[in-house]
Amino acid sequence: MTSGNNINQPVTYPIFTVRWIAVHTLAVPTVFFLGAIASMQFIQR
């Protein structure tokens, strides 16, 4: 039970910022364009 700290920080992948950047460089523009395209459907006269 002394290795309870290992659960909070996995030693196998200590660098999670590269994974965070890789996910958000794809997720943020995707959500932005989906929101922009969805909003265009309603502003047509």
From Swiss-Prot:
Pfam families: Cytochrom_B559. Disulfide bonds: none annotated. The chain crosses the membrane at residues 20-36. Its main location: membrane. With its partner (PsbE) binds heme. PSII binds additional chlorophylls, carotenoids and specific lipids. Heme binds at residue 24. Keywords: Electron transport, Heme, Iron, Membrane, Metal-binding, Photosynthesis, Photosystem II, Thylakoid, Transmembrane, Transmembrane helix, Transport. One of its GO terms (molecular function) is heme binding. Its cofactor is heme b. Belongs to the PsbE/PsbF family. This is Cytochrome b559 subunit beta. It comes from Nostoc sp. (strain PCC 7120 / SAG 25.82 / UTEX 2576). The lineage of its organism: Bacteria, Bacillati, Cyanobacteriota, Cyanophyceae, Nostocales. The gene is psbF.
